[in-house]
Amino acid sequence: MSKKIMMVILIIFTKFFSSTICFKCGTDLIKREPVLMNNLKPNNKRRLANEYTPIKIKYDYSQLIEQDYLSGNDLNDLINLFSEVGESFRSLLSIVHEDILVDTDDLKNHCEIDTYSSDIYNSLITHDLLIFPVINTEMDEYTMAQSWVCLYANNFRPTVGVVEINPNFSLYQIDAAYSMKYLLLHEISHILGFTGFVFRNLNFIYSETINGEEIFYINSTKVIEKAKIHFNCENIKGVALENLGGVESAGSHWEARYMLGDYMISTDYSEIVISDITLAYFEDTGFYKVNY
């Protein structure tokens, strides 16, 4: 094959790849101090302790709409994707609901949210988790989204979070809607508790040094149980996390060398699955019951 033909093939491949590029998650780059819910005002009304119901996620698009970066079609398509992702989590996770009254001062001071719907005060009475999708104009071209939890309950369960979207995203490239849906599943999973902050505070991190490098693992009970089945290995002590240097920086993603294809690695991948190992983590937190 001539060099000229090979160059043409390479150019075609590169153009195709750029239209289906798998974007990275920027969550591990966000450095914000988590706030526990003593800054919220819990209501006295509670359900029975063992009454689990499918999780209900409330999205407040007020600030996203006010920012006015997205065209009508892009905005509607993005809202529809968020709704689809919410329904996906309703089919996967159940939770014991607790009524919480939202304090708008907390939203402003800890979540950087100053535009919200008129019914925001009761959002965590009607729902279990409150999420604000917003535009972030400072992301690089390969980071299409990132997320963070701004308010936690006293047991470290997330209650309010923010999903930041790159305004340059497009749902009209090849497979873009599919990729964005899985990226939103990924980002909202961080808000549900797949974060280094929760890992550490629930004592789920185990480390060992291999060839001079400190490796961090999630070693919670059901994660190990599912990992033994998945990898067909009875000696597994945990599932490795991305190593960002030091226990305080243990990443909020699985190590791709071992979990390539799982939706909670830090970069998107062409064939994504929600693995039983990741679902087992959510069950191990004690926040949720899981429908595997």
Task: For each feature predicted by the language model, list its residue ranges.
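Cleavable N-terminal signal peptides of Sec/SRP-targeted secreted and luminal proteins
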Residues: 3-22
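Extracellular zinc-dependent metalloprotease catalytic-domain scaffold
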Residues: 18-185, 191-292
